[in-house]
Amino acid sequence: MDNKNFYTWFNEIKKELGIRSASFTKIFEYLDSLPDPIIIVETGCLRKQGNFIGDGQSTLLFDKYTLSRGNGSKVYTVDINPEAIKICKEVVSENVECFIGDSVNYLSNLSKKFKIDKTKVSFFFSRFFRCKLEIS
């Protein structure tokens, strides 16, 4: 999937995101401004296939986006619920590294790995934090 095809797909499903569509649009605009590779770290993964209006699908959205960017772009996600990780792995591509466990420990270890590898995180997303993005 190239960037044009990503936006064709995203524009088709955007209405299913409800009020979150504006935030995801802003996120992807921001990511478009960054050089490859795009590295996204997420806490709390997709939990139910097709649940765009609820708490999920960010993992799928980020998966499709990073696939469209290519060049080593990747998503790292962690969830403490093994069932959620199982469902997530059934929906997303191998471009998403899924980890079962406590996010604090996972993020600490991932940070150490990224320091050694000199990997820069493009975007951090957590379903546990609610924030307001200024939409202009």
Protein language model regions, located:
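A short alpha-helical cap/connector motif
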Residues: 1-136
